[in-house]
Amino acid sequence: MTVVTTMPRDAAGTALLPERPRGPIMTDLIELLRLAGPVVLSRLGIMVMGLTDAIVVGHFSAQQLGYHAMAWAPSSVFVTATVGLLVGVQVMTARAMGAGNPHETGAVLRRGLVYAGWLGFGSMALLALFGPMFLQAMGLKDGLAEGATLPLIVFSLSLPVYAISVVLTFWLEGLSRPGPGAAMMWLANVVNLGANLLLVPGVLGPPALGAVGGAWATFIARTALALALAIFVIRMKEARELGVFDKPARDRPAEIEQRRIGYGAGASNFFEVSAFAGMNLICGWISAVAVAAYTVVLNVSAIIFMVPLGVASATAVMVGRAYGARDPAGMTRAGWIAFAVIGVIGVLFGLLLYPTKHWVALAYTTDPAALALILPALVLACLFFAPDAVQVVAAQALRARGEVWVPTITHLISYALVMGPLAWWLAIPKGMGLNGVLVSIIVTSFLAAGFLLMRFRMLDWRDRKAAQEAA
């Protein structure tokens, strides 16, 4: 006997229903996380490369590590400025894709490479010519200036290829393809480690080069990164469609806009990096132990900061695409989703660091005097992770939206005019020491985040009003 069973009509209909489509908020959230993940890995790779140099050189010789650190300090200013000045490549590429004009991205890339050439070779010349004089003028002791001069010159030689690698990485990120850049950054880290192990202690034949060997390892790794990225871009199947091989017509407004975005980002980077570096001076007025403790806090914060940097780049791409597509609602949605996500991530980092602060501090030092300063400073640092993360993401979102100078002015006010004087007042006259420096960073981070979020909201209101008037 055959038994025929039938499914109820409602159940059958339910079983055949297609998957519910995602709403725009969930779609943007998934896209943000997809873009941010590889970018975070890429930015972490930059930090690991510098950390590798320091570890290998430090194990070889503490004296050589001092030379390496002094040579790296002035070169890092040029590196940071270069990254900021070339942000326009990422933003303009995303805008072209959002406008449905992928061929224009090739013109953005070519302009970026020319600009990178000028920046790279100009920075190399300035650093090589004036860097040694700067070291001598600082009145450094124990032969630091003399020992750091040659590594500094070698570091300067890698600035042109580094600028090229930044352009290629930003261009791929603007195309919403951050994965290759992240993968190649970590391959460059492998090259850097191998070159360090070969050149610094002088194994397998070459003489031990110490700090100079670490600088040459950085040169080799940066060159390998630039070459790998260039080969990848040239061999992309879409390269011709994207205009990579086509000489673009001269477009002065686009050239100016691309550089203008970079000017604002470069100035912001300068203000922020200089302000945080300037805290070392105030800590030096407190005590040598305060300098060491602040260095630990800054190092931990810098590692955590790579996540907001990655989310900021992803946000710039998404807001830039919406800007190119003339989609104000898309810009608003992408921005506020990113602000919420990074705010939560910042809070989570603080909640994670607070109970583990002892282990983190012990990874750096076991000195009781240093630990007495590091532990409360790490507790205070937990309070600025969220606002600091929000401000960097909001600044990038505003630049992608066409607001170039508001973030720069905000960073000038917050970091140059508020943080430094407040840190000095709290640390020295008020007697709060290192904790006063950390409190000033907390206040400044909330101030910058508040300014930038308010400006983003003002643009939301402006665009909504314009849409209502047009209707």
From Swiss-Prot:
NCBIfam families given in the database record: matE (TIGR00797)
Organism: Caulobacter vibrioides (strain ATCC 19089 / CIP 103742 / CB 15) (Caulobacter crescentus)
Primary role: Multidrug efflux pump.
One example GO MF annotation: antiporter activity
Record PANTHER family: FMN_FAD EXPORTER YEEO-RELATED, MULTIDRUG RESISTANCE PROTEIN NORM-RELATED
Gene Ontology annotations of biological process type: monoatomic ion transport
Subcellular location: Cell inner membrane
Name by which UniProt lists this protein: Probable multidrug resistance protein NorM
